Curated annotation (Swiss-Prot):
Its main location: membrane. GO terms for biological process: proton motive force-driven plasma membrane ATP synthesis. One of its GO terms (cellular component) is proton-transporting ATP synthase complex. Keywords: ATP synthesis, Cell membrane, CF(1), Hydrogen ion transport, Ion transport, Membrane, Transport. This is ATP synthase gamma chain. It is found in: Cell membrane. Produces ATP from ADP in the presence of a proton gradient across the membrane. The gamma chain is believed to be important in regulating ATPase activity and the flow of protons through the CF(0) complex. It comes from the Bacteria. It is a peripheral membrane protein. Belongs to the ATPase gamma chain family. One of its GO terms (molecular function) is ATP binding. F-type ATPases have 2 components, CF(1) - the catalytic core - and CF(0) - the membrane proton channel. CF(1) has five subunits: alpha(3), beta(3), gamma(1), delta(1), epsilon(1). CF(0) has three main subunits: a, b and c.
Length: 287
């Protein structure tokens, strides 16, 4: 009986230590979530201004003819897949990877028809183990990434489209809704849809050296900015999912502690009752 009580006590201590860790991880994830939300908000005006200028140029007769705005016969498709480097984030990685695999299976019959640009160690390991065709990868991103952290892989993907090595490019990530809701999303990045110009707020710009050259310079930057915006959303989704997972783990640990504490108290009561019974039996035997 004493051995069983000691084991329950050790188990309670272990669960309390685990609860302390998961509670701390939940708080850290909440702080990182807010940081990435703020960063996404800060980056939005830059993307909006580029979009405004592109819409102004593309509304002209020559702008919409740029190759990055034109559909062409699809021989090969590229996918930029955003995952995390770390686990303990609930279904964050599994959900987007399942979505990507289903999309690939529906659209392609051969591995020659597509290639994957992967961000995050979890995605890299997943696709590598299953021999999916990887075109480029980046891992080890900071929890609050800067644009420079993904400039290389985003630029490489856009360059392959411009060089007609791929004919369409999709962006795959967990779209942030709230801390408890993230939507696995696969959306077309290239060819870009020309942003619609708001005539009520239209501004007449003068472009040097020409509107066509400005557009040619801005479109790749705009595509890369969309990748960065998706990355920030994905990071917010990751921390939201991790915060929820750690919150659930903390609640489960509390439930286990309560059940173990009840078992511990019952075991102690049984041990005390048995000890009293033995004392009484011994006293009666001496009488």
């Amino acid at each position: 009986m004493a051995k069983g009580i000691r084991e329950i006590r050790r188990s309670i201590k272990s669960k309390k230590d685990m609860r302390q860790i998961t509670k701390a991880m939940k708080m850290v994830a909440a702080a990182k979530l807010r940081r990435n939300q703020d960063k996404a908000e800060a980056a939005r005006p830059y993307a909006d201004k580029i979009q405004e200028v592109i819409a102004s140029i593309a509304s002209g007769t020559s702008g919409s003819k740029h190759p990055m705005l034109q559909n062409r016969p699809v021989k090969k498709t590229g996918y930029i897949v955003i995952t995390s480097d770390r686990g303990l984030a609930g279904g964050y990685n599994a959900n987007i990877l399942r979505k990507v695999v289903n999309t690939i299976n529906e659209k392609h019959k051969s591995k020659d028809e597509y290639g994957i640009f992967v961000i995050g160690r979890k995605g890299r390991d997943f696709f590598s183990k299953r021999n999916y065709p990887l075109l480029d990868e980046v891992t080890g991103l900071p929890t609050s990434p800067a644009f420079a952290d993904i400039k290389k892989i985003a630029g490489a993907a856009v360059q392959m489209f411009e060089n007609e090595q791929i004919d369409e490019l999709y962006l795959c990530y967990n779209k942030f809704q709230s801390a408890i809701s993230q939507i696995p999303t696969v959306k077309q990045l290239l060819p870009l849809e020309a942003p619609e110009s708001n005539n009520a707020r239209a501004i007449n710009y003068e472009y040097e050296p020409s509107s066509e050259e400005v557009l040619a310079d801005l479109l790749p930057k705009y595509a890369e900015t969309l990748v960065y915006s998706a990355l920030l959303e994905a990071k917010a989704s990751e921390e939201g999912s991790r915060m929820t997972a750690m919150g659930n783990a903390t609640d489960n640990a509390t439930d286990m502690i309560n059940r173990l504490t009840l078992s511990y108290n019952r075991a102690r009561q049984a041990a005390i009752t048995q000890e009293i019974s033995e004392i009484v039996a011994g006293a009666n035997a001496q009488a």
